[in-house]
Amino acid sequence: MTQAQTAAAQPDAIPVAAPSPQRWRVADVVALFELPFNDLIFRAQQVHREHFDANAVQLSTLLSIKTGGCEEDCGYCSQSAHHDTGLKAEKLMDVDAVLDAARAAKANGASRFCMGAAWRNPKERHMPALTEMVRGVKALGLETCMTLGMLEDEQAKQLADAGLDYYNHNLDTSPEFYGQVISTRTYQDRLDTLDRVRDAGINVCCGGIIGMGESRRERAGLISQLANLNPYPESVPINNLVAIEGTPLAGTAPLDPFEFVRTIAVARITMPKAVVRLSAGREQLDDGLQALCFLAGANSMFYGDQLLTTSNPQTQKDRALFERLGIRASEADAMSADA
């Protein structure tokens, strides 16, 4: 039986991959979520293999270059000045210290280096150091990404001129659930920043956080928003809430881990050429669940012992898992989707 015949024989006539162009209605995304688990994972793996090497995963390292004291009130975040989490606010790191961390990340096998700053938006006085960081990290042969909050047009242009590969600015959740998590920044603020990043010629890294108490339909609403961006993001990080003491979401019940795997699969189907990244909260998944995430179409993960202010599986454990699964680390330039 050919691959086409195999696909045609599967139950539930929902497209394996979105024809282009297609608007993903929330109801369509909900229908994907509600497929039997095996059917959903099978379809996601089909899509994944159409565009990527199914046994290659990109390793990314994330560094907090400016920690704590953020003006925003994001209910999940330990770095918000609105929450009493015991985290001490720090100034922007020196460029040399950032480059030292990037060298260590590369030596550990990472091909992508992400730099995150806890503030509402960068000030003009920060831009020279930020652009120097980008140039320095690129000179090491690493793919670069920054997440700095909202940007103005000129700031996006400066980062683009420095050679920034990706800018991360997450939508976090669906428009309907958003107001229950954040009040200091609107959904439209986030969309406007993504437009500025696109207009500057920088690749978009945009995803969200699940397990914040949202419904399945609201999770589908997030995926619908992401998939309907024009174009959808090149990089889609999916975070599993880490309920941090002192934040408003500290008492949130953990998400069913199979729902997390479903979310990875639905992201893969609706955004077939995106790099789908396992992000915060991976430490909460055992090896079997992480293997299911790779089967569902995840092909990147944050690698290293720390993600901003939350812990992450140790690098030795990740290497051992890769060896057991026959997965290899992929170079950044090898992660472009096949046409």
Swiss-Prot record:
> Pathway involvement?
Cofactor biosynthesis; biotin biosynthesis; biotin from 7,8-diaminononanoate: step 2/2
Task: Name one process (GO BP) from the record.
Answer: biotin biosynthetic process
Please state the Enzyme Commission number of this protein: 2.8.1.6
Q: Which Gene3D superfamilies match?
A: Aldolase class I
One GO molecular-function entry: biotin synthase activity
What the record notes about the co-factor is: Binds 1 [4Fe-4S] cluster. The cluster is coordinated with 3 cysteines and an exchangeable S-adenosyl-L-methionine. Binds 1 [2Fe-2S] cluster. The cluster is coordinated with 3 cysteines and 1 arginine.
Q: In what residue span(s) does the Radical SAM core domain sit?
A: 55-282
Q: How does it assemble?
A: Homodimer.
> What protein am I looking at?
Biotin synthase
Q: Which species does the entry assign this protein to? A: Burkholderia multivorans (strain ATCC 17616 / 249)
Q: What gene does the UniProt entry assign to this protein?
A: bioB
